[in-house]
A protein has these predicted regions:
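Beta-strand segments within the central parallel beta-sheet cores of soluble alpha/beta enzyme folds
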Residues: 157-165
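N-terminal helix-loop segment corresponding to the beta1-alpha1 unit
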Residues: 2-143, 147-156
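Short Gly/Pro-enriched turn/cap motifs at secondary-structure boundaries
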Residues: 186-194, 201, 213
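Aromatic-enriched alpha-helical interface/lid elements that frame and gate functional surfaces
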Residues: 198-234
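Mid-domain beta-loop-alpha active-site segment that forms a flexible
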Residues: 130-145, 164-172, 216, 220
Length: 234
């Protein structure tokens, strides 16, 4: 919506106006036009289909099976816009034994393996909450752009089945490859990064409570020593 696209978002309830509006609503709906539609009613569905006929991309994140029941599945949309692109976001994808299980960020954060690897060795798995939702939304946007490029080349639209669980798994690719290669299950390790040091957030002795330091080679280590007035450590 910030890149010259016209975005219309169907709302469940009428948004609050003025100072009572949620800051989160303003954040996630920046530059988007809202429309209140009851698509369970024929007249609401008809309005939606008229919008689809004028659109390039439709993105939805209903629970699997809902769009089919409402008559707004991909097969329905191509009847009014043959080259439409539809991106469906769900917790576990539209096929498979767990496809009907709904989920929010805390659920697919765990299912994707990220929660298990986030935190300290002596602590519980940690949620990163909204960051997971944003990653899934970003993946949906990139999928839509790739589909638009494909349509530009071929003239064909397409349906994209996006699993939030799989998107989360892309964040732990190194851990997945390690397990596949060695059979070892990676463990939580706080902010520690095994290939670089110092590379962490450290407590301070002065007024600043914390400092973030990232050193990746000998040249950066020497520069850090000079900055700390500890040249003898170089």
């Amino acid at each position: 919506s910030s890149a010259a696209s016209d975005v219309y978002k169907r709302q469940v309830d009428r948004p609050e106006l003025g100072l009572d509006r949620s800051p989160r609503f303003n954040e996630v709906n920046l530059n988007k036009a809202s429309i209140l539609l009851n698509i369970a009613r024929p007249e609401g569905r008809d309005v939606l289909l008229r919008l689809v006929a004028l659109s390039d991309v439709v993105i939805e994140n209903f629970r699997p099976g809902v769009v089919e029941r409402l008559g707004i599945a991909y097969d329905d949309l191509v009847k009014v816009k043959p080259d439409i692109i539809m991106v469906s976001i769900s917790s576990n994808g539209r096929r498979g034994p767990e496809s009907e299980h709904p989920g929010y960020a805390s659920v697919f954060n765990a299912l994707g393996g990220l929660g298990y690897l986030t935190g300290y060795p002596d602590g519980p798995p940690t949620e990163i909450r909204d960051s997971v939702d944003l990653r899934v939304g970003t993946a949906a946007a990139f999928a839509a752009m790739a589909a638009l490029l494909h349509r530009q080349r071929t003239g064909k639209g397409q349906y994209v089945d996006l699993s939030a669980r799989e998107v989360v798994s892309t964040l732990i690719g190194e851990a997945l490859v390690e397990f596949a290669a060695t059979g070892r299950i990676p463990q939580r390790d706080g902010n520690h990064l095994g290939v670089y040091a110092p590379y962490d957030v450290y407590p301070c002795a002065g007024e600043d409570e914390w400092v973030a330091i990232a050193v990746t080679d000998d040249q950066e280590w020497a520069a850090l020593c000079c900055a700390m007035g500890q040249e003898w450590l170089r």
